[in-house]
């Protein structure tokens, strides 16, 4: 089954690569229109997925990731329309020039070909990835989690209907709807057909892909994000940033999970933090110093060492007191996932040091980690947030779904 999907996807990719920007945008507009027209069928499938997930005991954080509402689906359709407004990188001449030999050389952006994406309980990923791949002339094979298989299947049917209406092969966007996990291992070995693989899920999925895939893999999306409250931090705006980074949408990968507090500000800052977190419904997981200093009003539990490596994806926050900047940077190096980390400070020397020494995809000064997002960065919808260094890093927009080729123009030109 998968080999036939791969053959069809590869054939579709050759046709997509020849489309003009206008032709690709017309397809995306049609997809957005169909998502709204077929909203009832998609939401009906999603209700079934959510009910089964709840019966299976999924956490509230996971259920939130899984759930679609009319407003969320409308926003997804609008995101597709926003992709239409983005500049198409395909065909862009990155650099080049006339060589001494007389050869005119160009380095030109081209589609990757076929992209494979394995993801878990995020139904919006289906549309986000499909729209970005189509905009860049790539075919895509999707393998969503079993928790969303009905929603994904309904969504892909809508996308394929739009493709067919525009005279394009339905195989340009395909989904593996069989929940059999063995198919993931088979997909990981489809290097004959898939040019790049993107896993979006937990650490186990990323480890499996890194160890078993014969396809180039881009990993990311695991966000054990930190905020360091420096000794010079202004407490009121610091609290505002922390509330945003923790509570705006706790189930996202750019949500802060660990707060590092400089010991020189701890006795002044921690009581204010506790009051604010109590109002926000956040449970604090405190180290020994925090447990000694705080006695309410926020719910406070002792920090377990293994929690420093956890994505809570819920209203839980580790709080650790560190001796100095070295302690904060060392902690992030040991427990961070190179996703998004921030410093809150009024000392620009310390800010510069933090930016230079914290090796994460996104580093912030006096700002929330929640900004690590394709839309917020002006990239449009994102296919993933890469926490590695090749071939993309941070929110992966359109350019990350392209490669390049060298093109030489001669006139009977030969090498001397």
From Swiss-Prot:
EC number of this enzyme = 1.2.1.41
Pathway, per UniProt? Amino-acid biosynthesis; L-proline biosynthesis; L-glutamate 5-semialdehyde from L-glutamate: step 2/2
Matching Gene3D superfamilies: Aldehyde Dehydrogenase, Chain A, domain 1 (3.40.605.10), Aldehyde Dehydrogenase, Chain A, domain 2 (3.40.309.10)
Class in the EC hierarchy, top level:
oxidoreductase
User: InterPro entries, alphabetically?
Assistant: Ald_DH/histidinol_DH, Ald_DH_C, Ald_DH_N, Aldehyde_DH_dom, G-glutamylP_reductase_CS, Glu-5-SA_DH, GPR_dom
**GO cellular-component term (any):** cytoplasm
Q: What is its main location?
A: cytoplasm
Q: What GO terms are given for molecular function?
A: glutamate-5-semialdehyde dehydrogenase activity; NADP binding
Keywords, ordered alphabetically = Amino-acid biosynthesis, Cytoplasm, NADP, Oxidoreductase, Proline biosynthesis
Name the SUPFAM superfamilies for this protein: ALDH-like
HAMAP family per UniProt:
ProA
Q: What does this protein do?
A: Catalyzes the NADPH-dependent reduction of L-glutamate 5-phosphate into L-glutamate 5-semialdehyde and phosphate. The product spontaneously undergoes cyclization to form 1-pyrroline-5-carboxylate.
PANTHER family in UniProt: DELTA-1-PYRROLINE-5-CARBOXYLATE SYNTHASE, GLUTAMATE SEMIALDEHYDE DEHYDROGENASE
Q: What is this protein called?
A: Gamma-glutamyl phosphate reductase
Native species: Salmonella agona (strain SL483)
């Amino acid at each position: 089954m998968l080999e036939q999907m791969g053959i069809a996807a590869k054939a579709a990719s050759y046709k997509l690569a020849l489309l003009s920007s206008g032709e690709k945008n017309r397809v995306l507009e049609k997809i957005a229109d169909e998502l709204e027209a077929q909203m009832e069928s998609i939401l009906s499938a999603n209700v079934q997925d959510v009910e089964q997930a709840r019966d299976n005991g999924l956490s509230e954080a996971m259920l939130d990731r899984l759930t679609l509402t009319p407003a969320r689906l409308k926003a997804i359709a609008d995101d597709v329309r926003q992709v239409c407004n983005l500049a198409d990188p395909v065909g862009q001449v990155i650099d080049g020039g006339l060589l001494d030999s007389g050869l005119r050389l160009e380095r030109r952006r081209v589609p990757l070909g076929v992209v494979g994406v394995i993801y878990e309980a995020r139904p919006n990923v289906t549309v986000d990835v499909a729209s970005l791949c189509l905009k860049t002339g790539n075919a895509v094979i999707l393998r969503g989690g079993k928790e969303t298989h009905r929603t994904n299947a309904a969504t892909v049917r809508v996308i394929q209907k739009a493709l067919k209406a525009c005279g394009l092969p339905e195989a340009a966007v395909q989904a593996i709807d069989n929940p059999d996990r063995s198919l993931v291992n088979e997909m990981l070995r489809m290097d004959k057909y898939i040019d790049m693989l993107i896993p979006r899920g937990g650490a186990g999925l990323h480890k499996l892909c890194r160890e078993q895939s014969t396809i180039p893999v881009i990993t990311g999306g695991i966000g054990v994000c930190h905020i360091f409250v420096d000794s010079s931090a202004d407490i009121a705006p610091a609290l505002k940033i922390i509330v945003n980074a923790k509570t705006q949408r706790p189930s996202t990968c750019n949500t802060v999970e660990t707060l590092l507090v400089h010991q020189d500000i701890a006795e002044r800052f921690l009581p204010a933090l506790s009051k604010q977190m109590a109002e926000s419904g956040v449970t604090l997981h405190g180290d020994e110093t925090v447990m000694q200093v705080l006695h309410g009003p926020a719910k406070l539990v002792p920090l377990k060492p293994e929690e420093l490596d956890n994505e809570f994806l819920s209203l839980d926050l580790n709080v650790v007191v560190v001796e100095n900047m070295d302690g904060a940077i060392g902690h992030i190096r040991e427990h961070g996932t190179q996703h998004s980390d921030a410093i809150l400070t009024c000392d620009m020397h310390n800010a510069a040091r933090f930016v230079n020494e914290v090796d994460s995809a996104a580093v912030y000064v006096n700002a929330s980690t929640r900004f690590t997002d394709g839309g917020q960065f002006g990239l449009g919808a994102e296919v993933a947030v890469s926490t590695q260094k090749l071939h993309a890093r941070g929110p992966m927009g359109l350019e990350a779904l392209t490669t390049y080729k060298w093109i030489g123009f001669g006139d009977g030109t030969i090498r001397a």
